[in-house]
């Protein structure tokens, strides 16, 4: 093999030989100008039909009629030979390091394909010895550039022209749809002849690579390796942004692209600031409290919280702020400006964050989920409040009584108990309330609105709490049980009131007479004795009553209804209390005993009346004559003397009496007759 120096001298001699100037432009005959013919691989590789000359130049498997066999010197260079050529070319000079032509293809082509077929001007063709050997000297490579510029050879994949330089090589590395080297087995095509040579060693359909796990066949070893990673579960490629791992590097690259497409940035500085959010590095530390930040701007904003200075002051009310952005938002309160408008319903907001939160009411989006119970919320603040249900945290404490609350709104409402503040006033009757919800419920008295409807019977209620109590009638549920006697109740309030029977606790006292009650409702009813209020009136006779239950019982006199019947004797009563009292006649039960004399009574009212005998008290006084009585019933009978009322008539003779006992005695006269 001739030495490198000898070849360089031969090239220089060729350049100095007399003849036409090598820089004279000559008409270039391109391969694409040759007549086109079809070949078996044209459909598979997707390239247009080629001429015989082009086919032989780019496809070593194609044979012309006069070239039946391929000789050894026409074969493609092995990769080892190419590597050796590259190493030898790199040793020539540092001045020509960037001009090394990686794959010398001209010398690898069939003898019938000359430089003329590649469009090289006759004056710029390489010496025959160099074109056959495939070695290029710097001087010879200079022939291929020259004053014509680096546009003498075409890249097969593009219309642009390049010289034999890194420009052509870089172009040939770009993936393209056109691969001018069709593979005659399977119709595959390749961009470079070296790729085709490497492909010839890939297993064919006759000798595939088979996965031992699933039996799937592959045509390449890399595909088989990736398939085996799927079976082993190995995930060696981790995403730096989200921490997710992947078994293939290509999938990881796609993942990186998805992160980059999620957020767009105006410049490199914005992108760098954004990347600091993913990094755990926080180099900016507050000297006051030690809190660290990833950005210097965030630190500066935070440091203003330690400063008492509030340089941004509102011209309307004088309120000061540490940040100008907070002042701008505040000023919208005075101006009424609401620049952020919902595209769905048209509702406007002063802050963009409020619009984002509001928009979730239309979309139903609830991105904040509780890790304990899975309940989802549309706002992070609502999630934090909810999580206190699980933790039991009650950070807000009343300064007056020490009672803690999980929400600051509940503390504010509670504090009005101590201050007596009632800021919510009814515009119809002037009644004031401490809570807005109480005012809303109260207004339903005036409007008659009953929005809460029972889905079983259709009955409507003004309050949801009353509906819940009503629904227990249908279910029969009594979840509240007394721990002392085992009695069950449908409502917790009823259980609390019942427990006062065992404890003797009567926290509700009358301010007029000092009488105490176990229930607040009983105190309210009792106070009507002092006020004389009787708001419930009978529509039949006009009689009024202090309690609604008493009116209902009275109306049974007019309609004759006696729904409460004794299962022993069949006697019916218009009141359940009268039935209970009557049943003690059959049982002989007298649970109420006088502590003074030991006498027993079936009714508590009878015991109370009896105890007055021992005390000598006469609380019932006649307003006409001033006479006092120990029992209310005796006073009523006495008052008939003054009024002349005789409600008890004899059915036999029609005589009337003021007392029932006198009527009974009179009726004995008729029975004797």
UniProtKB/Swiss-Prot annotation:
| Entry-annotated residues carrying N6-acetyllysine | 478
Q: Where in the cell is it found?
A: Nucleus
Q: SMART domains, alphabetically?
A: ZnF_C2H2
Q: Where is this region: Required for nuclear localization?
A: 332-364, 464-494
Cross-link type Glycyl lysine isopeptide (Lys-Gly) (interchain with G-Cter in SUMO2), residue numbers = 253
Ranges annotated as spanning the membrane: none
Location, primary (coarse class): nucleus
The answer, when asked if rRNA-binding is one of the entry's keywords, is no
Chain positions of all zinc fingers (C2H2-type): 209-231, 237-259, 284-306, 312-334, 340-362, 368-390, 396-418, 424-446, 452-474, 480-502, 508-530, 536-558, 564-586, 592-614, 620-642, 648-670
Q: Name one GO cellular component term.
A: nucleus
Which UniProt keywords are given for this protein, alphabetically ordered? Acetylation, Activator, Cell cycle, Cell division, DNA-binding, Isopeptide bond, Metal-binding, Mitogen, Nucleus, Repeat, Transcription, Transcription regulation, Ubl conjugation, Zinc, Zinc-finger
Region spans: Disordered:
1-42
Q: Does the keyword Amino-acid biosynthesis apply?
A: no
Tell me the first and last residues of the signal peptide: none
**GO MF terms on file?**
DNA-binding transcription repressor activity, RNA polymerase II-specific; RNA polymerase II cis-regulatory region sequence-specific DNA binding; zinc ion binding
Please list the residue ranges that the record marks as compositionally biased, kind Basic and acidic residues. 1-10
* Gene Ontology BP terms: cell division; cellular response to sodium dodecyl sulfate; negative regulation of apoptotic process; positive regulation of cell cycle phase transition; positive regulation of cell division; positive regulation of cell population proliferation; positive regulation of erythrocyte differentiation; positive regulation of kinase activity
Family label: Belongs to the krueppel C2H2-type zinc-finger protein family.
Q: Outline the subunit composition.
A: Interacts with INCA1; the interaction inhibits INCA1 activity and induces the cell cycle process.
This protein is called: Zinc finger protein 16
From what organism does this protein derive? Pan paniscus
Q: Give me the gene this protein comes from.
A: ZNF16
């Amino acid at each position: 093999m001739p030495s490198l120096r000898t070849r360089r001298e031969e090239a220089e001699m060729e350049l100095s030989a007399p003849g036409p100037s090598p820089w004279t432009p000559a008409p270039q005959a391109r391969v694409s100008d040759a007549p086109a013919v079809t070949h078996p691989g044209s459909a598979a590789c997707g390239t247009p039909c080629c001429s015989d000359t082009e086919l032989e130049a780019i496809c070593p498997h194609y044979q012309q009629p006069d070239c039946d066999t391929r000789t050894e010197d026409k074969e493609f260079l092995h990769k080892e030979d190419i590597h050796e050529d590259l190493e030898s070319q790199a040793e020539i000079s540092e001045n020509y390091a960037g001009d090394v032509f990686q794959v010398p293809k001209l010398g690898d082509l069939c003898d019938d394909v000359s430089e003329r077929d590649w469009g090289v001007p006759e004056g710029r063709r390489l010496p025959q010895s160099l074109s056959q050997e495939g070695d290029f000297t710097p001087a010879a490579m200079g022939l291929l550039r020259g004053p014509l510029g680096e546009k003498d050879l075409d890249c097969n994949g593009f219309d642009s022209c390049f010289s034999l330089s890194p420009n052509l090589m870089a172009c040939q590395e770009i993936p393209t749809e056109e691969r001018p080297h069709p593979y005659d087995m399977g119709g595959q095509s390749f961009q470079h002849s070296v790729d085709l040579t490497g492909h010839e060693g890939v297993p064919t359909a006759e000798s595939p690579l088979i996965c031992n796990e699933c039996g799937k066949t592959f045509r390449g070893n890399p595909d088989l390796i990736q398939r085996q990673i799927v079976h082993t579960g190995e995930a060696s490629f981790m995403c730096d942004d989200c921490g997710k791992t992947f078994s293939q590097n290509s999938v990881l690259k796609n993942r990186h692209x998805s992160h980059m497409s999620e957020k767009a940035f105006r410049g490199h500085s914005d992108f760098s600031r954004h990347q600091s959010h993913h990094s755990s590095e926080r180099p900016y530390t507050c000297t006051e409290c030690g809190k660290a930040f990833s950005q210097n701007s965030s630190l500066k904003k935070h440091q203003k919280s330690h400063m008492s200075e509030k340089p941004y002051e509102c011209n309307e009310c004088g309120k000061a702020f540490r940040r100008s952005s907070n002042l701008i938002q505040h000023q919208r309160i005075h101006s009424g400006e609401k620049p952020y408008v919902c595209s769905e319903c048209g509702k406007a907001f002063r802050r963009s964050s409020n619009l984002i939160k509001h928009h979730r009411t239309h979309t139903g989006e609830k991105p904040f989920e509780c890790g304990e119970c899975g309940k989802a919320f549309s706002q992070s603040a609502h999630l934090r409040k909810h999580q206190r249900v699980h933790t039991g945290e009650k950070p807000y404490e009343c300064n007056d009584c020490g009672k803690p609350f999980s929400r600051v709104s509940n503390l504010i409402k509670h504090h009005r108990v101590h201050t007596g503040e009632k800021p919510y006033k009814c515009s119809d009757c002037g009644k004031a309330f401490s809570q807005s919800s109480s005012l809303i419920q109260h207004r339903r008295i005036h409007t008659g609105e009953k929005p809460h409807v029972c889905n079983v019977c259709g009955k409507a209620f003004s309050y949801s709490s009353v509906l819940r109590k009503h629904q227990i009638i249908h279910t029969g549920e009594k979840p509240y049980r007394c721990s002392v006697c085992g009695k069950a109740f449908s409502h917790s309030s009823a259980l609390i009131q019942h427990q006062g029977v065992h404890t003797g606790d009567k926290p509700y006292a009358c301010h007029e007479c000092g009488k105490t009650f176990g229930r607040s409702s009983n105190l309210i009813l009792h106070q009507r004795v002092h006020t004389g209020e009787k708001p419930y009136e009978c529509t039949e006779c006009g009689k009024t009553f202090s309690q609604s239950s008493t009116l209902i019982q009275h109306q049974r006199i007019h309609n004759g209804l006696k729904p409460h019947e004794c299962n022993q004797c069949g006697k019916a009563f218009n009141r359940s209390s009268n039935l209970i009292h009557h049943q003690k006649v059959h049982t002989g039960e007298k649970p109420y005993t006088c502590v003074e004399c030991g006498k027993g009574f079936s009714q508590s009212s009878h015991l109370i009346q009896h105890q007055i005998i021992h005390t000598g008290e006469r609380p019932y006084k006649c307003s006409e004559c001033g006479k006092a009585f120990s029992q209310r019933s005796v006073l009523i009978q006495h008052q008939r003397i003054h009024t002349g009322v005789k409600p008890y008539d004899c059915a036999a003779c029609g005589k009337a009496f003021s007392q029932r006992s006198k009527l009974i005695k009179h009726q004995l006269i008729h029975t004797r007759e």
